[in-house]
Amino acid sequence: MKCPYCGSLDNKVIDSRLSRDDTETRRRRECLECARRFTTYEHVEKAPLMIVKKDGRREEFLKDKVRSGMMSACQKRRISINIIEDFISELEQDLMEMGEHEIPSSIIGEKVMKKLHALDDVAYVRFASVYREFKDVHDFYSELKSLLKKQ
């Protein structure tokens, strides 16, 4: 690793630690030329996940997009942002573990609906109304009716 101060390639690692989420290694290094210390971070380079939309378009998987949809559905509900953030991290990990570079958007939508269904029925119906493209009040009624049957 090149020293950011003098440009020397001679240095030694004096400390290594994993990040809180175990996705990065933080290394403290000391330059053997100028004796100054610096920090480097090492992480696995991930290939971007591509989402295949209903119309065949492909987009990069964006956690912010999932977060935005869930936050809209959960607005004014008693659902902690931490629960949403944890779910999004789990979702991304699940998608990575599938081993596919292209994933149908339907898989993500169904996983989000399943999670919201477990958390809060109102948030679930809100999300489902957008995801399933409810056209009128009858679509809401059908979804609510099936929810009530399950209770």
Swiss-Prot record:
State where the unnamed zinc fingers lie.
Answer: 3-34
Which GO biological process entries does UniProt record here?
negative regulation of DNA-templated transcription
Mind listing the UniProt keywords for this protein, alphabetically?
ATP-binding, DNA-binding, Metal-binding, Nucleotide-binding, Repressor, Transcription, Transcription regulation, Zinc, Zinc-finger
Recite the UniProt cofactor note for this protein.
Binds 1 zinc ion.
Keyword Metal-binding in the entry? The reply is: yes
GO MF annotation terms:
ATP binding; DNA binding; zinc ion binding
Q: Does the keyword Chaperone apply?
A: no
Residues in domain ATP-cone?
49-139
Which cofactors? Zn(2+)
Bilayer-crossing regions: none
Cross-referenced InterPro entries, in alphabetical order?
A: ATP-cone_dom, NrdR-like_N, RNR_NrdR-like
UniProt family annotation: Belongs to the NrdR family.
- PANTHER family reported in the protein's UniProt record: TRANSCRIPTIONAL REPRESSOR NRDR
Say what the protein does: Negatively regulates transcription of bacterial ribonucleotide reductase nrd genes and operons by binding to NrdR-boxes.
What is the name listed in the Swiss-Prot or TrEMBL entry for this protein? Answer: Transcriptional repressor NrdR
This chain's source organism reads Desulfosudis oleivorans (strain DSM 6200 / JCM 39069 / Hxd3) (Desulfococcus oleovorans)
User: Highest lineage ranks of the organism?
Assistant: Bacteria, Pseudomonadati, Thermodesulfobacteriota, Desulfobacteria, Desulfobacterales
